[in-house]
């Protein structure tokens, strides 16, 4: 891990997408904090410097008074010359009409609208934030951006600072008899394949064991299906990554989640990890063994 701290200060107009932005940075592997008082930033950075957990930080700072701006300006001047710190200010903006529409949709009041008129609060906030916007290295206008598109823009601008992939694939096996995985994006059913359970010498093994893996894969229908499966999955992965999805969960299921699905999930993970960041898990692989031991 680099010794240099990478800090992104996220600010901008209320309703312009700061919540989506900070969630996007979290997906990119940043340590994130929402609504940090500017005066606490130097002390916070001092603590982070002594921590080995993460060298990438993104935090939201809201400017809601003239004193807040003077505070953040003093803090930025203080940290600007630090040799071990690379920091940027990301400013999120949108047109007044779009911000008004968003507030009406959520039925929330603007934090600076003392008389309840949203537009008055927006105009006051824009006046207070103008100097900070002018000194920001990154300005994103979210007027025409959906939350998904904003995530994509942030990923394109900031993911390059991260040496680790921002898109991860989770390949898992499971048993249909125990229920579908709630977090699965893609589910594939291999219950139509010959079942090793009916081979007594294989019954107590799993798809991770060579005899079971070989038995599952030696059948022509297994090879044909796997070829189609890999051919389906590989072309769509760049699309999921392009859309800003941080984790894609691919689940392969058989009856009990011990033999066929485990073998297929293992082979799929082995092939995908040649080009992608892949984690693997086998939810129900040992469930039958645990049930037998309890009985």
Swiss-Prot record:
One Gene Ontology MF term: GTP binding
Top-rank taxon: Bacteria
Binding site for GTP: 62-65
Keywords, alphabetical: ATP-binding, GTP-binding, Nucleotide-binding
Pfam families, per database record: PapZ_C (PF22740), RapZ-like_N (PF03668)
SUPFAM superfamilies in alphabetical order: P-loop containing nucleoside triphosphate hydrolases (SSF52540)
Classification via PANTHER family: RNASE ADAPTER PROTEIN RAPZ (PTHR30448:SF0)
Listed NCBIfam families: PRK05416.1 (NF003828)
Protein's recorded name: Nucleotide-binding protein SSU05_0620
